[in-house]
């Protein structure tokens, strides 16, 4: 046995490539690659899915560029500051929020869409014990 020890002899004698699985039945190596996220491996199921996900962002960018061309740089900056201020205000975690002020800033308060009918607060996924939810939000648990 040399000065490196028994572990180094075993490591040198057995190639690592032979121990790794390959082929269609290969399992994910958690120690080397970490946890796998299926969400990152999925492709959009429809060509319009990405467009629908980014619709509001694209709509806001278009409105800001129109405002900048018509009224100058001040109008989109003011509107962006109002958006940031409205998005920072939150209710307690167990109370449903309609984000009415954000809808007013975007002009969505004058339209009726499917989210107005199908977005019933009583069917929310966040229903739970109020005290536990607040303690979790504040980091006390």
From Swiss-Prot:
Task: Tell what triggers its expression.
Answer: By interferon gamma.
| Organs and tissues of expression | Widely expressed.
Cited InterPro entries? Ump1
Q: Where is this cross-link: Glycyl lysine isopeptide (Lys-Gly) (interchain with G-Cter in SUMO2)?
A: 39
Give me the Gene Ontology terms describing cellular component: cytoplasm; cytosol; endoplasmic reticulum; membrane; nuclear speck; nucleus
As for what it does, the entry says: Molecular chaperone essential for the assembly of standard proteasomes and immunoproteasomes. Degraded after completion of proteasome maturation. Mediates the association of 20S preproteasome with the endoplasmic reticulum.
- According to UniProt, the name of this protein is Proteasome maturation protein
Organism this protein belongs to: Mus musculus (Mouse)
Q: Which gene encodes it?
A: Pomp
């Amino acid at each position: 046995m040399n000065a490196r020890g028994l572990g180094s002899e075993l490591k040198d004698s057995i190639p690592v490539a032979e121990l790794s699985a390959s082929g269609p039945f290969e399992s994910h190596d958690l120690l080397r690659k970490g946890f796998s996220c299926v969400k990152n491996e999925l492709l959009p199921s429809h060509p319009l899915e990405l467009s629908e996900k980014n619709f509001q962002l694209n709509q806001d960018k278009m409105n800001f560029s129109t405002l900048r061309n018509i009224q100058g740089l001040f109008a989109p900056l003011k509107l962006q500051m109002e958006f940031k201020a409205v998005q920072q205000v939150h209710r307690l975690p167990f109370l449903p929020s309609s984000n009415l002020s954000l809808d007013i800033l975007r002009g969505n308060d004058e339209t009726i869409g499917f989210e107005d009918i199908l977005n019933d607060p009583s069917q929310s996924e966040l229903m739970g014990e109020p005290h536990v939810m607040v303690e979790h939000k504040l980091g006390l648990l």
